[in-house]
Amino acid sequence: MEGESPYGSIEFENRASVIRNPDGSIVSKWDNVSVPKHWSQVATDIMAQKYFRKAGIPKHLKPAKEKGVPDWLQPSLYDQAKADQEASEADSSAVDTTVSETDAREVFHRLAGCWTYWGYKHNYFDTEEDARAFYDELCHMLANQMAAPNSPQWFNTGLNWAYGLNGPAQGHFFVDPKTEEVMPSKDAYTRPQPHACFIQSVKDDLVRDGGIMDLWTREARLFKYGSGTGSNFSDLRGDAEPLSGGGVSSGLMSFLKIGDSAAGAIKSGGTTRRAAKMICLDADHPDIEQFINWKVHEEQKVAALVSGSKTIKRL
């Protein structure tokens, strides 16, 4: 109802979130995480371990005072004056002026507020009251697990709006709503990467744009902010096929293993989740049998390691 908090009927409580290895050792631990009381521990762990912004949030913020935007919907900016004041009062320049998200309501506000802000900027609402109702309903639905966006939204959306975070451009683009032209993003967070999955093409070329090595760069850019990607590699020539400069190709599989290793080394969104990657290959490709047996060979390695470790224990 108007004037009431979207969390008025929801009880929140503090919990701990611990992720352990199979041997019991702790991978990550967060204490005093505030979440709705009706949430399961699994939901708590996902929010705390994956979706909380864990570093770099300025402790001191101020409204941007953007013209035409209601006070409650104003973007936030880093308040340098307050940060300097805290440092001077503490008589130390080593004062930590950043914090992390520890309350689910901070995340709900970051998401719903950013969505509402952009909607308000582009006249999606007839009145400010409609915008407020939209914001409140989103917060209520997120807290009650009635709706949830994809992971890149949890990772990236609202970091600039809610906390004034900024960073160098990462090679992303957006469509300018006024000119309808594709423009390069000026920074990493004002127009972040909130999309989940991408299908990318790859040419039978080693180093030029659109080629094999360029694909690994593009994939890394997507993985960094929490998205997944997939490609059909059927255009790449098979093992021992001739090259234009002489010699023969090392084959599709050698390059797929490079891409797989690169993806495995990247944590999506800078969290504990690994990158998501899909590889497709047409059935008439010369290397199709090697491709099909790729996973079989990896499973055989695991079986050999398990068998070997059990044998060693018996010795």
Predicted features by range, described:
Residues M1-L315:
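Extended catalytic cores of very large enzyme megasubunits
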